Amino acid sequence: MISFSHWNSHIRSGLSLSMIPSANSRFAFIIQRNYIPVVNSQNTRWKRLCGTQSVWSPYKKKHVLVNRLKHISLFPKPIFARKFTTRQKSEDQKQWRILRITFLVLPFTVGGLWILYRVKNRKNNIFSFDELELEERSNRPRSIFGKIKQFFNILLRSFNLFIIFSPIIITLPFIALISFLHLRSLSSLTVSIWLRFLVTQLERAGATFIKLGQWAASRTDLFPPAFCKTLSKLHSHVTPHSLAYTQSVICKTYKVESIEEIFVNFNPIPIGVGAIAQVYTATIKKAATQQDNSYFTSMLQSIGFRQKNISDAPVTQDVAIKVLHPNVEKYISLDLQILGFFAKLINLVPSMKWLSLPDEVKVFGAMLNQQLNLHYEALHLNQFRLNFRGNRYVEFPAPYDDYTTNQILLEDYMPGIPLSAFLKHKSGPFNKLLANTGNNALFQMLIVDNFTHADLHPGNVLVKFYKGIPKTIFNQDNEINDSIYKILSTCSTEEWDSAMEELNILGYRPTLVFLDAGLVTKLSTQDQKNFLDLFQAVLTFHGYEAGLLMVERSRQTERVINKDIFALKMEHLLNEIQKSTLSLKSLQIGTILQEVMTMAREHHVRIEANFANTVLSILLVEGAGRQLYPEMDLLSNATPYLRSASSKSNVSLTNPMVQLWIALEARQFLLLSTSKETVEKWVKSDMIAPNI
């Protein structure tokens, strides 16, 4: 029991004393006053309690904590308690200083590093690719009942597919015999009818097989050209799902009772129906972000600034809404497992192993999984917008990140004229600019960014017109109305020519808008090197060396048939092109690459899927460009992009990108310093790029 009579005088003088007792602990005294006088060091009672002379100083403000009392069981020593033992004074002050600095500096350091990491690695979406892949793996059935249910679903789906494709399987040996008798040509009437029937059955089989046919049409390295050409006509004749389903998905996703709470107008008729999803147009009440295509806004977004929230944007905005079909994920998952089983079965045949069908099914499945999760398309659009920021002639629709889920993609509605309308009329003052713009966009994707749109057919490209400069935050009213675009899309050739001339006189300029970015291609370092080496070989007509390089760098070198003959065929192909070419600008790179892919198939030279997709993109863009402007010089368009990429890469003469850039620069110099006739003569006589 402690007597506190000693403290009465201090309490009367204005000191406040509090004691916090606890069993098996120490007492702590907190003395509060505006200032505290020096305690008499001769006071024996104080010395008996404290065990030492007090180190308090006059006029010490606020609280003083005394925690080292002898002969008394006090609290466990607090971490911030200051010790007053003279012997430990310097050590305690040093520890206190270290603790204080640590607890003050550490939160700011960690927080600052986290902010820097977020700004540097920020993608304009709340999801990353790793998170999406984790989400896909988590959707797989884990329980025994789920696996049993999935097994029976696979059996039912297999039976359904067997009924659909049984006529194809039964007639296949007969068709193979006819093809063999006609010297392996698939151009006969019977085979053509069979191929059209195959297309019909693929359309009946559903989304997976529609996409499978479209994918096979791009793999000229695996299938005959006539087969690929027929499959390229495959379209998704899918019945649109009901409006009620779309409304239920939107209400469930956005947690509203009706779509009128979000949209002012909602067009119930879809503007596009695909194998996996369909697209509507609507007017949103409050835009989730202030959609702005200006360079300044894009620059701010690239360094981490987010756009305004929905509550800050009172204006309406026209949007496009992509909604997945019901149960499409379930059916595609079942189909991929069935395809994987049959791919492994076919791979057991020795003559079919070079195709590596199980690997191709994995690549095809990864492609479909990207399209089944609309977050991927939003990520791709954001990346394309970042890559092309400041480009006045190329646009991508801006996705609304806060409104995008794996089932719904909300993005800007982009009015415009389909590029197919320009290809149909084939005349106009903007054709040359459109052809060069498309090629420039392709080379930036392929060479500079290594992030290429993998579905560049004309249906996914629109043309918008701006007056002088594109729309910015300072200039909003320089764009043509959507109704005018619809009229132009359906007008006759005479009306078309007149309208284009009038737009040109008024100062309007075209801008390409790329849609449907669900699929992209990224070449690995080795694939990019192979592509540039092949591109350089085509330019310099070194066919034999290019053929040997393709064989050496293929995935299954041991399965290649007649390596030397393949290299000789490459040399013969480029020699024939060299002799028949009137000028270098008339080189059709896409056609040459397609011939190379055909020879690779005949000799079992294994080509990577991304490499094949890149060749397909070049074929599509070059084909459309030459229809618009037959005199287009593809190689001249590639030169500035190779120059830019070479300056950023390893500047070495062994770098294929640097070599290709030097070759194109030399060609440009020759064209400027001599006549075209002289250059063409040098090319034909093999003086510029001799074959050794």
From Swiss-Prot:
GO cellular component terms, A-Z: mitochondrial membrane; mitochondrion
Record's bilayer topology term: Multi-pass membrane protein
Keyword Nucleotide-binding belongs to the record: no
Protein's GO biological process: mitochondrion organization
Span of the transit peptide along the chain: 1-91
Keywords of this entry: Membrane, Mitochondrion, Transit peptide, Transmembrane, Transmembrane helix
Transmembrane segments: 96-116, 161-181
GO MF entry, a single one: kinase activity
Location of the protein in the cell: Mitochondrion membrane
CDD domains recorded: ADCK2-like
Any Pfam family hit: ABC1
Keyword check for Transmembrane helix: yes
Record family assignment: Belongs to the protein kinase superfamily. ADCK protein kinase family.
Protein name: ABC1 family protein C21C3.03, mitochondrial
Species, as recorded: Schizosaccharomyces pombe (strain 972 / ATCC 24843)
